[in-house]
Amino acid sequence: MDPIAENILSDLKKEVLREVTREKASRFSRIVKNESSAKNYAKAMFDIASDIGKIEVIKSDLNVVYSSLLVDNDIFNFFKSSFIDGHLRMRILKKIYADKILEETFNLIAILVERDMINILFAIIVEYENLCNEYYNIIVVKITTASNMTDTEDMNKLKDHITNMISDKDIHFTFNIDENIIGGVVIEVEDVVYDYSVRRLLTELKSSISENN
């Protein structure tokens, strides 16, 4: 476990202090119109991060909070539960995080806890990272194979081909192993999936045989 997250987890289990004021959350309340939308929260957070020049710091803050909350189900359920006194949850939240993350990040977490929406934090982080990638002109390409092919000649050729196709972006490759695809490769570029797996070919073959019978 990350040392920062470990320290926070330890504190979360024992510390209580006073409630965070509603005034500190007011900026988010004005920006965010749709409480159920992680995209809106992420956009509000990113706009503020951009304004204060802390895009990467807030990105790190969000991941620290997420990892420290979710590492223990009891802690996560404590902050998620609407049956636990809101003032108590806020007091603990302030004691643990107020001096460890930026005030802007803390305000977002406080709003999520106050509105019983901490369960969408991961979705907010994903959307925030997407906005970061867009800002830095980064595109993430996920490559899935049935076995480890990261350093092979075939993989290097595939990466070169993709890089030539998307020459106007800074490409960040991620690699995943999934034995269920049997062979071949599955490439994900943003929301588009290019499935060249053996599994897909077998599925199509099976479907074709069924239609002809």
Curated annotation (Swiss-Prot):
Recorded name of the encoding gene:
atpH2
- Write down the InterPro entries for this protein, in alphabetical order: ATP_synth_OSCP/delta_N_sf, ATPase_OSCP/d_CS, ATPase_OSCP/dsu
Asked if the keyword Magnesium belongs to this entry, the reply reads: no
Q: Give the originating organism.
A: Brachyspira hyodysenteriae (strain ATCC 49526 / WA1)
Instruction: List UniProt keywords, sorted A-Z.
Output: ATP synthesis, Cell inner membrane, Cell membrane, CF(1), Hydrogen ion transport, Ion transport, Membrane, Transport
Subunit structure, interactors included: F-type ATPases have 2 components, F(1) - the catalytic core - and F(0) - the membrane proton channel. F(1) has five subunits: alpha(3), beta(3), gamma(1), delta(1), epsilon(1). F(0) has three main subunits: a(1), b(2) and c(10-14). The alpha and beta chains form an alternating ring which encloses part of the gamma chain. F(1) is attached to F(0) by a central stalk formed by the gamma and epsilon chains, while a peripheral stalk is formed by the delta and b chains.
**Highest rank taxon of the organism:** Bacteria
Q: GO cellular-component terms in the record? A: plasma membrane; proton-transporting ATP synthase complex
Membrane topology category:
Peripheral membrane protein
What name appears for this protein in its UniProt entry? ATP synthase subunit delta 2
